[in-house]
Amino acid sequence: MLDDEVVWPEDAIEVGRIVDAWGIKGGIKVLPFSSDPQALFSSRRWFLRPPEKPMGPKAAKPLPTLLRITNAREQGDVIVATAQDVADRNAAEALRGCSVFVSRASFPTADVDEYYWIDLIGLAVVNREGQALGNVADLLDTGAHSVLRVTQVETDDQGRSLERERLIPFVAAYIDAVSLEQRCITVDWGLDF
């Protein structure tokens, strides 16, 4: 599909990057950005953004901005996929370096008390006393559990703005409640931590 025919979803989320071709029939290898790549499996429409500097051979025709996925499976640390729009290895190699986006609406429904990181980023964080600790800027994966990186802009004695960062483990011992509707996380965490 050509660029002018494709309408990107407003809720497009970057979920991986095409790293290489797979086989001779146009398969592509995608490095997912999550250890649980279900978003790639649940969507049959992958939106592509080309790299700033092409990594593969120059394409004979414009790169597609939408792939209609016919099959996707895990292969070690990558996802191997085939698409209607990629006919052979040369076409697959031309996609090397493209970022892969899917609609957030196509993500599988999370289980109770499970959240996609993308849904937590930007939420306000308050403690049990109602004191604002900042907003979730990012999450870190420590292997054992996720950690919220909460940032808050504060003013020092000279009136300069300083960004304060708190790292709060995303575990039941510290997380009292998560409300996606109210866009707020309540934590057992003091201002002085």
Swiss-Prot record:
Q: Where in the cell is it found?
A: Cytoplasm
Task: Please state the protein's primary subcellular location.
Answer: cytoplasm
Keywords of the record, alphabetical order, are:
Chaperone, Cytoplasm, Ribosome biogenesis, rRNA processing
This entry's Gene Ontology molecular function terms read: ribosome binding
Ranges for domain PRC barrel come to: 112-193
Q: Which HAMAP family match?
A: Ribosome_mat_RimM (MF_00014)
What name appears for this protein in its UniProt entry? Ribosome maturation factor RimM
Q: From what organism does this protein derive?
A: Methylibium petroleiphilum (strain ATCC BAA-1232 / LMG 22953 / PM1)
Q: What is the lineage of its organism?
A: Bacteria, Pseudomonadati, Pseudomonadota, Betaproteobacteria, Burkholderiales
